């Protein structure tokens, strides 16, 4: 099995590439694994990379090194490929996906020794207009807050939480809150505002 670290260099408040390279090298050395590191270059690149690799049919474990966006992109790239598995190394701003594993999970995911031979558990995916979501699909104000948090993330004055709170404030104070939406769930259509 190949172990590929997909690193989003834009994730988080600090450059964590060296930390990931060190983890990958340790796995290669300590366990004689086939390990490779790849950097993403733009939005959607992780999806394209992982899909192309998964399409070869070779067994592969991807390490999503970034935040929730990187995790989401890799999930979209490997969806439908039983030869591909994913775990994550949380170096993003929010890392909300990890909250599904308990409040004390993050340190476990920051140590690749815990991840390289872990059990693979299938996840149901949420299909949202042809794009998959893992455990949550946000709409309206919540989605706008998540999208604009990155505008504040570049500020050296704000932490990850500070960026989130700034985004909440701006979206509640300066943007319209209500929007019309339509959801299809198990062939039932629901429309509302």
Q: What does each model-found stretch correspond to?
A:
Residues 60-65, 69-70:
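A glycine-rich beta-strand to alpha-helix segment
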Residues 28-32, 79-84:
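Short helix-capping segments at alpha-helix termini
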Residues 9, 65-67, 89-91:
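Glycine-rich beta-strand-to-loop/alpha-helix junction loops that act as flexible
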Residues 16, 73-75, 98-100:
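Short glycine-/acidic-enriched loop or helix-start segments at secondary-structure transitions
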Residues 70-82:
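Short Gly/Thr/Asp-enriched flexible loops that form oxyanion-binding sites at enzyme active sites
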Residues 1-62:
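ATP/NTP phosphate-donor binding region
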């Amino acid at each position: 099995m190949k172990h590929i670290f997909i690193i989003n260099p834009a994730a988080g408040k600090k450059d964590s590439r060296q930390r990931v390279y060190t983890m990958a090298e340790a796995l290669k050395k300590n366990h004689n694994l086939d390990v490779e590191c790849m950097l993403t270059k733009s939005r959607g690149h992780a999806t394209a990379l992982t899909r192309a690799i998964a399409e070869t049919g070779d067994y592969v474990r991807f390490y999503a090194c970034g935040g929730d966006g990187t995790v989401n992109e890799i999930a979209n790239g490997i969806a439908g490929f039983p030869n591909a598995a994913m775990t994550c190394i949380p170096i993003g701003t929010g890392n909300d996906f990890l909250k599904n594993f308990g409040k004390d999970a993050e340190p476990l995911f920051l140590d690749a020794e815990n991840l390289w031979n872990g059990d693979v558990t299938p996840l149901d995916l949420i299909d949202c207009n042809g794009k998959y979501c893992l455990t949550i699909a946000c709409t309206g104000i919540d989605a706008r807050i998540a999208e604009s948090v990155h505008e504040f993330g570049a500020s050296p004055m704000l932490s990850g939480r500070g960026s989130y709170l700034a985004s909440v404030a701006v979206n509640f104070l300066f943007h319209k809150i209500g929007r019309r939406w339509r959801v299809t769930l198990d062939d039932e259509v629901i429309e509302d505002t």
